[in-house]
């Protein structure tokens, strides 16, 4: 169906008192992303010409958090209802475009449902998203005559008979810009709350003989709003359950779907296995046959085919080629790169460092600002001393180097191919190819040494 041009209004002015937080409610995160960002992303995916964000409390925090989004900021200085919020945005509406109204605290609304609503909107009428609830207490009821929608009555203004209606208003609707402006201008606050309700435009449209078409969402969770942290946590679990289900159906083996969190986008190959309590953040790519152990956090990284990540390892902004093994308890920080078959063991940290093909750093090591060749052995307790308190310097280690345990490499320094660094050495000058570097203090031995004893 050919749709009119469309702009989106997102209401995000509420204080969120029941969150008990200094952060504006809509900035609280779901799956690692602000609730309002989920809604903005949906609007953009729908192809909105403009996104008008109506804000009030915490405006500076909102603008800082959403500075990269192309938004038209609309101030609602006083919170006098949803109709009042839309009135603030109305001057920006074009007469010949459709206006879709969304909410910053309803984060799981799907693009598919919104597109169906957009397609269903009758010419000159209103498309309305409604849902039926077993217990509709507190929600605005949809009134009908001969099956046709005639209006919405807020719970506090409803009669006992109207309160028996189970079909409720979700608050999400779409209408033509010129019509919307005309109806908004006619709103009054003659109700129990003394507020301007956007829902009153439904009755105004009906009085003009305009058609109102109701559409239902695919899932109830799509239209559930967040007023407190309990509701937010419940929606988080709904979202994560949906993501886990998609991954399982796509062939990813999640050992326990209830203990997996996806806070971004996961691209994966075949026969991927993910153990419990794993968190995926940002954009992550997993190759074929990747195995991730329990308790790992993977963020903005590419993991090649046949890699194995042992439990409680953190990988951030890193790249692993095929057949690498890391962990347990390893940390790859931004700029870490492992070439094919490399191994990083327990309590090893890498940052802005490359570990070559078949090279190994097995235990208790820090590799920062380093370039390490192929088939290198990094002994336990090795440290690249890359920082002098003001500037960072690079360590370069050639192919086939053996670095003994408890070695300090004071950068800038280069170790040539095939060199050997003796255990306990502090390397302060370049080491030539196939050379042995050793800087230990000569060992002394005192025979018959008696240990000190405590004085009584």
Curated annotation (Swiss-Prot):
Q: Where is the active site?
A: 363
Does the record's keyword annotation contain Metal-binding?
yes
Task: Quickly give the catalysed reaction.
Answer: alpha-D-glucosamine 1-phosphate + acetyl-CoA = N-acetyl-alpha-D-glucosamine 1-phosphate + CoA + H(+); N-acetyl-alpha-D-glucosamine 1-phosphate + UTP + H(+) = UDP-N-acetyl-alpha-D-glucosamine + diphosphate
GO CC annotations, alphabetized: cytoplasm; membrane
Give EC number(s), comma-separated.
Answer: 2.7.7.23, 2.3.1.157
What Gene Ontology biological process does one annotation of this record name? cell morphogenesis
Q: Keywords of this protein's UniProt record, alphabetized?
A: Acyltransferase, Cell shape, Cell wall biogenesis/degradation, Cytoplasm, Magnesium, Metal-binding, Multifunctional enzyme, Nucleotidyltransferase, Peptidoglycan synthesis, Repeat, Transferase
Which PANTHER family does the record associate with it? BIFUNCTIONAL PROTEIN GLMU (PTHR43584:SF3), NUCLEOTIDYL TRANSFERASE (PTHR43584)
Homology family? In the N-terminal section; belongs to the N-acetylglucosamine-1-phosphate uridyltransferase family.
Write down the NCBIfam families for this protein, in alphabetical order. Answer: glmU, PRK09451.1
HAMAP family named among the record's database cross-references: GlmU
Name the chain's protein: Bifunctional protein GlmU
Origin organism of this chain? Escherichia coli O157:H7 (strain EC4115 / EHEC)
Q: What is the lineage of its organism?
A: Bacteria, Pseudomonadati, Pseudomonadota, Gammaproteobacteria, Enterobacterales
